[in-house]
Amino acid sequence: MATQKSTTALDAKSKMTTDLVRPLANFPSSIWGDRFMSLSIDKSELKTYDKVIEKQKQELRRLIIDPSMDSNKKLSLINSVYRLGLTYLFEEEIEGQLDKLFKEIDMQEACNEADLYTISVNFQVFRQHGYKLSCNVFNKFKDYTSDHKFKEYIMADVRGMLGLYESTQLRIRGETILEEAFAFTESQLKGVLDTLEGNIARQVKHALTSPFHRGLRTVEARIYFSNYEEECSTYDSLQKLANAHFNYLQLQHKEELASVIKWGEDMDFKTITPYARDRIPDLYLWGLGLFSEPHYSQARILISKMAQLICVLDDTYDAYATIDELHLLTNAINRWELSATEQLPEYMKPLYKVLLNEHVELEKQLSSKGKSNFVNASKKAFQELAMGYLQEAEWRHNGKVPSFQEYLKNGLITSTYNVFAKSSLICMSDIVTEEACTWYDSDPIILQATGLLGRVYNDISTFQFERKRAQQQITSIEAYMKTFGVPENVALEELKKMVEIAWNDINKGCLNTNEISKKLLAPIVNLARMTDVIYRYNDKFTFPEKTIEEYITLLFCESIPKN
């Protein structure tokens, strides 16, 4: 019924705007149907889980600050806490312990006595928390006397190689040993995967598909709980806390998803933009990806709404409107006033009003706090995005392939990272200082790298689909081929290298930073992670039947049995 309704609506809109030739994409319909339309939760269950969390939190806190615990065991515990998404519960305690260990212990000497897995865990913990532990801790595993690069005996240590592989995801530019270790461990782990069984097989398979550092936090926490039973069961309080915490979050996220779906129904997107992708459950995943902690409930809802607005704007510019209509829409967005509605085609008017009205609501919420300037920043980001989308549409319309640098300059805008960044500031306005705003406005390397990652990864995964549906599509692949005179396969390889360099820069931006708090950095890194999850192998947003379907099912439909 939903498909028939959308088709009818689309036909009606087409007749209203005459028989124009439109660049229709014919996106696949939502795989969810009305599956999440009637989500309901038992509030008493939330209270039950909350009591368990509070009790086990106290027990685990005592372990984290226990001065008698061996440093390697403590770092292993902190690693499990981090991977289970529980760090926010113990921020001060963990920071205090890591600061003490990093300053008081000679980590190079300590690592000389440890095995590969232990060193890898220690390296990951410090890097993940912003400490620049030297990659030289892995030097003792190098073989400088042969062509093997690494000592042969570690090939038999699958657990150690897996730890090293995960460590390489945290590398920055110039860390040659980690570049070599990445190639070595990836090759070795792929080679032995079919011979493995049990948890280690699941751990290796998942890491090769989605390395932890680049994964969606809530999904990785759930998978860690299942695949790393030994690590999670070492401490009873850790296991019980993780169990209750995941089930608590699942109930909370169901409630939020229901709220976003209802908003989408109230806005009537299926009728006003029937040509656009219907992906609200998938878009909620972006909100969940950027903000995973329970206290960011409103942030997840806001990011989901912004993602929906971005999605329908993208599809309007890319897959429905004519070039003349796009000029009218862009002009209206730049004016940002209700009277501009009159210049728009009938089918565009409802969408334009939704865009304006959502920001009016935001302004009402933030004006009492003196934070309305964040809404202005969001408006500006949408205006820049519209101009970027229009530029791409003009290139397509005129059959022009821009230079790679010209494309990339515009592509950093159409990657949408700036809209998400400004929306994140709205979500965290209570802790955003003037210095932080200045830092954001300076367009630091980590923000540029996140934007580049989004644009290039998107192009790599979607260009074949785009070519099939339209004669003239302009992506970074075509721009690179034209600028440097190389064939498609070479362009793709070079762009993939750029993705890895972008990750190097993102990693560096998280180390020893005094310019901005880790809390404000988190959604930026999480945006890069979401991009990686969505576009690593294909466009999982447009075609969500595999990975995204599995993730949403895992997060919303499969609870963990109570302890």
Swiss-Prot record:
Question: Which cysteine pairs are joined by S-S bonds?
Answer: none
**Functional pathway:** Secondary metabolite biosynthesis; terpenoid biosynthesis
Free-text tissue specificity from the UniProt record: Highly expressed in leaves. Expressed in roots and flowers.
Q: Which residues form a coiled coil?
A: none
Q: Which residues bind Mg(2+) 2?
A: D314, D318
- Superkingdom of source: Eukaryota
InterPro entries named among the record's database cross-references: Isoprenoid_synthase_dom_sf (IPR008949), Terpene_cyclase-like_1_C (IPR034741), Terpene_cyclase_plant_C1 (IPR044814), Terpene_synth_N (IPR001906), Terpene_synth_N_sf (IPR036965), Terpene_synthase-like (IPR050148), Terpene_synthase_metal-bd (IPR005630), Terpenoid_cyclase/PrenylTrfase (IPR008930)
Co-factor binding comment? Binds 3 Mg(2+) ions per subunit.
Classification via CDD domains: Terpene_cyclase_plant_C1 (cd00684)
Q: Which residues bind Mg(2+) 1?
A: D314, D318
Look up the record and name the cofactor or cofactors this protein needs: Mg(2+)
PANTHER family named among the record's database cross-references: LYASE, OS04G0344100 PROTEIN-RELATED
Q: What does this protein do?
A: Sesquiterpene synthase that catalyzes the formation of sesquiterpenes and sesquiterpenoid alcohols. Converts farnesyl diphosphate (FPP) to 10-epi-juneol. Converts FPP to tau-cadinol. 10-epi-juneol is the major product.
Protein's recorded name = 10-epi-juneol synthase
- The organism is Inula hupehensis (Inula helianthus-aquatilis subsp. hupehensis)
